[in-house]
């Protein structure tokens, strides 16, 4: 009996433990909060398993959905949607979403990726006082990074990648003392980095790639824990930055660095594994010690102007697996450790240097020497030479070149005097038709995002054409190839030897310019490539024999076969008109073209004088802008700095609203897409705008009475109302009140989604005009306009007060 009594406490303890549920039970209020989030996110597929009976804290985690609880509260919530998720409907409220999140007071980690979230990140985000990790990447959030984030003292990771955040990186960033990861890739952030960034001693990852940041970098050597620095695709420069010696990954590609690569800085990076300095203008000697850094595995210095003489006995780290040193000014021999015979499997690219190899892609040594002189750098020599000797050598070389040039000039003048013609024959083509300029023109791709590169457009690389090629394409510019003449020259339709059609614009130069003076403008023009622009494929210079100045320029454009947009709206292209869905798609294409002109290249191209007749349609009915403000067309030379400087109704310069002039022009185009008839006067635009404004607040019938009769029964009311609202906002008199191009795009995409859903749920009785274009073997001529800075406005619609 005594033994039984002694065992009773142990038995009671076992029974007590068995009676306790081994699982964590979430508070009912927090369960309701999670279900409310599901509702606010419009029931995404990833949350299909959630219902009133879900045991959230004990659900099986997955890569796309995880809920972590501690005791009876949610501490982590990870929701990852599908790639390419559309924006949530217009009724979505980011404020309501964050207000609901605040009801999870103990949450430390939030991940909301690819869920279609949109709007300004609200100020009440600071109520998530326990937050340590916030990841809202791959959504549609915009506006500045809210100051209220600075009060989240425990925040360690902030990831805002692939959104539309704008403005500068705030200087309050040092108010986050625990911040270890800051990733803002693929937004539209701009300005220089604040010096306060240097105070984040705990920062391990700084990723700012593919934004619009510029200027010199602050001193980063104090970030003693920084391991990853990714600044690709901005405009940082010109000096090589001061860095922490604990970096593992350093990416500075596609920026505006123009200094030497500091050998002292890089030689101390003993943990560096990945180094990418490509597509800059780094000059001076290439620090060969980079190849033998103790941890280096990836090295890319391509497309710079680095000099130096390589030797076969240079050493490489045995772990180095990838090296790209192409398109520099390197001489000497390829190091043995980089050759395939060295026994190590490495990817090595070294074309377009001046190396002594059997590779046919090398240039002559004289080329690298001359280019080095052009950038103020002398190639390294084996033996040490005094500064005085170098100076004397350079001086003698310059004098020799000047004497030779003078003698050649005298000879040419005498020969020219013997000619019987009164004017020099402009037949000297100073460039060969080749890909020779491609590297120079397109290597500077730091202003263009990866998705806008050549391969994705299906276009050939920008190149120089010979006059013979253009004469062949147009049958010596015969009249049958003539398409028209505007203020900027004649346009011909041509067919190249490969069978592709092109549009060729011929410009007679009104001022004396050498080819060298024009190359800066050519480099800008070569970058204007986008799916929704009529892109330039190349150029040709024709020069006078006597002084080699350019007499004529030819620009070769891609050919757009389906003609002007207006013929598909009001004129009835071959008896067909665009459907409502196609009109929305065209509007989205035009907006994307404008967005690229404003943000896809630096400096942006503004004040493009866009008109309905400037929008062309390709075989897939994709819209292409054929008129944009190129600085190099006759009168525009020497005025590049004034691009986009005019603003608003009064024509006064303003940096803040320079993009809003194109927004007004877009509003006029959108108005014509809606009403379906040509608008050729400002008075028409003003009257229709007022009618549109009144119909928005009226009933459905009033709105449909404004629409092109051929499509007014084939559009949903919400889609139509959204299009009308954004159109009226674009036409506001005050430029500052007009929407941004990102706002325009959001509304157009929302209208498209609403229309798509409406079509799926109904069978409209009138869906007139479903074009099915077929390109003929010789497409009809399409108009091509390229606007200069000082050119008179083309006819077709009088210039509106913008």
From Swiss-Prot:
Domain Protein kinase, chain residue ranges per copy: 477-759
Keywords noted in UniProt: Cell membrane, Glycoprotein, Leucine-rich repeat, Membrane, Receptor, Repeat, Signal, Transmembrane, Transmembrane helix
Basic and acidic residues bias locations: 791-802
Localization: Cell membrane
Extent of the LRR repeats: 71-94, 104-128, 129-152, 153-176, 177-200, 201-225, 227-244, 245-268, 269-293, 294-317, 319-341
Region named Disordered: 761-802
Segments traversing the membrane: 392-412
Gene Ontology molecular-function annotations: ATP binding; protein kinase activity
Membrane topology: Single-pass type I membrane protein
Main location, first listed in the record: membrane
InterPro entries in the cross-refs: Kinase-like_dom_sf, LRR_dom_sf, LRR_R13L4/SHOC2-like, LRR_Rcpt-Like_S/T_Kinase, Prot_kinase_dom
Positions with biased composition (Low complexity): 762-777
Family stated for the protein in its record: Belongs to the protein kinase superfamily. Ser/Thr protein kinase family.
Note on domains (UniProt): The protein kinase domain is predicted to be catalytically inactive.
Protein name per Swiss-Prot or TrEMBL: Probable inactive leucine-rich repeat receptor-like protein kinase At3g03770
